[in-house]
């Protein structure tokens, strides 16, 4: 998401010196990351505020995976303000604990984030993962109900709940099978089960 706006602090004349960008202010991330983005922008952007193009700003900022969205404000005659919304961390990559998955679908190096997140196993595919997360959120489950998510190359998912119940899902009709799994887990008659296998259409297999 990009929002571009302008502010006129005073009347200006069409002189080159007035049009020159002499201040770029970036906010929203850590001080270190704000500085990195500022320096990159200073090196790459046009020196004239009137010739500044949003696609050039986007090309630079999109290199930083921590960014979820941002707004740009031109403060005439010579200042640019960029406010950044940091992406939310939603999962950890299982084979490399130094990387997190952002809500923007990008991988971010983990510097000091220690809060609990689901582990993602299998080859990471941003689009498929975000689509699957959306399906979960549209079911009666919450994404935070799971501590491990397994993705298989043939487009099938398994999920392990925080109560150590493994749900084996089919390749299709995920929302429907998630609803079935939720009903089983909510039923006291099945309180000791450890596996819910829903891979075969119209069949439910449970194991203790």
Question: Language-model segments: which ranges?
Answer:
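Extracytoplasmic/luminal low-complexity segments enriched in Pro/Gly and acidic/polar residues
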Residues: 172-208
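Terminal hydrophobic membrane-targeting helix
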Residues: 9-112
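Extracytoplasmic
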Residues: 19-21, 32, 65, 75-79, ...
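Solvent-exposed, non-transmembrane alpha-helical starts
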Residues: 48-50, 91-94, 129-130, 168-172, ...
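Extracytoplasmic segments of membrane-associated envelope/inner-membrane machinery
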Residues: 81-153, 159-160, 166
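Hydrophobic membrane-insertion alpha-helices, especially the h-region
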Residues: 1-7
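Second-shell loop/turn segments in exported
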Residues: 26, 43-47, 117-125, 165-172
């Amino acid at each position: 998401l990009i929002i571009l706006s302008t502010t006129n602090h005073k009347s200006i004349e069409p002189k080159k010196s007035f049009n020159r960008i002499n201040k770029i202010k970036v906010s929203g991330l850590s001080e270190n990351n704000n500085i990195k983005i500022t320096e990159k922008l200073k090196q790459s952007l046009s020196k004239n505020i009137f010739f500044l193009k949003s696609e050039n700003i986007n090309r630079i900022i999109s290199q930083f995976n921590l960014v979820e969205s941002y707004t740009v404000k031109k403060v005439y005659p010579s200042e640019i303000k960029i406010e950044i919304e940091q992406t939310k961390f939603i999962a950890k990559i299982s084979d490399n604990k130094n990387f997190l998955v952002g809500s923007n679908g990008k991988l971010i190096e983990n510097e000091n984030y220690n809060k609990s997140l689901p582990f993602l196993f299998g080859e990471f595919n941003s689009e498929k993962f975000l689509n699957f997360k959306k399906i979960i959120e549209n079911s009666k489950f919450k994404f935070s109900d799971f501590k491990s998510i397994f993705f298989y190359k043939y487009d099938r998912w398994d999920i392990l709940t925080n109560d150590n119940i493994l749900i084996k899902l089919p390749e299709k009709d995920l929302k429907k099978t998630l609803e079935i799994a939720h009903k089983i887990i909510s039923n006291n008659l099945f309180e000791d089960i450890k596996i819910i296998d829903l891979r075969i259409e119209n069949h439910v297999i449970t194991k203790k």
